[in-house]
């Protein structure tokens, strides 16, 4: 029994705005089914005596302080913006 259906694959492809053929949907269904099957095998691993791991190595990122600096004057920004109105840069709409 498949753990994922062709309809689910097509639905996810639609949500991702991907155009896939029926053959591709069938291929992805088989591939995703094998991936899910492998992930389910991990549930069978005995982890009773295993400490939870948050990081593989005992390292941590060293980052600089996040300090706000002086930005560009609004006038300079607007000079370089191809389209602006009332102190705001206008950009083309990307949402329907």
Swiss-Prot record:
Top enzyme category: ligase
EC number: 6.3.5.-
Protein name (database record): Aspartyl/glutamyl-tRNA(Asn/Gln) amidotransferase subunit C
Alphabetical list of Pfam families matching this protein: GatC
UniProt subunit comment: Heterotrimer of A, B and C subunits.
Coiled-coil features, chain-numbered ranges: none
Top-level taxon: Bacteria
Family the UniProt entry places it in: Belongs to the GatC family.
Keyword vocabulary terms for this entry: ATP-binding, Ligase, Nucleotide-binding, Protein biosynthesis
Purpose of the protein: Allows the formation of correctly charged Asn-tRNA(Asn) or Gln-tRNA(Gln) through the transamidation of misacylated Asp-tRNA(Asn) or Glu-tRNA(Gln) in organisms which lack either or both of asparaginyl-tRNA or glutaminyl-tRNA synthetases. The reaction takes place in the presence of glutamine and ATP through an activated phospho-Asp-tRNA(Asn) or phospho-Glu-tRNA(Gln).
SUPFAM superfamilies from the UniProt entry: Glu-tRNAGln amidotransferase C subunit
Gene Ontology biological-process annotations: glutaminyl-tRNAGln biosynthesis via transamidation; regulation of translational fidelity; translation
Gene giving rise to this polypeptide: gatC
InterPro entries (alphabetical): Asp/Glu-ADT_sf_sub_c, GatC
Catalytic activity reported: L-glutamyl-tRNA(Gln) + L-glutamine + ATP + H2O = L-glutaminyl-tRNA(Gln) + L-glutamate + ADP + phosphate + H(+); L-aspartyl-tRNA(Asn) + L-glutamine + ATP + H2O = L-asparaginyl-tRNA(Asn) + L-glutamate + ADP + phosphate + 2 H(+)
GO MF: asparaginyl-tRNA synthase (glutamine-hydrolyzing) activity; ATP binding; glutaminyl-tRNA synthase (glutamine-hydrolyzing) activity
The organism of origin for this protein: Bacillus velezensis (strain DSM 23117 / BGSC 10A6 / LMG 26770 / FZB42) (Bacillus amyloliquefaciens subsp. plantarum)
């Amino acid at each position: 029994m498949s753990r994922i259906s062709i309809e689910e694959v097509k639905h996810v492809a639609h949500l991702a705005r991907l155009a896939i053929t029926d053959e591709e949907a069938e291929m992805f269904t088989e591939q995703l089914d094998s991936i899910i099957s492998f992930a389910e095998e991990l549930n069978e691993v005995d982890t009773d005596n295993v400490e939870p791991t948050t990081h593989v190595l005992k390292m941590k990122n060293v980052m600089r302080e996040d300090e706000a600096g002086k930005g560009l004057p609004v006038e300079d920004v607007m000079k370089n913006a191809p389209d602006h109105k009332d102190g705001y840069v206008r950009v083309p709409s990307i949402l329907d």
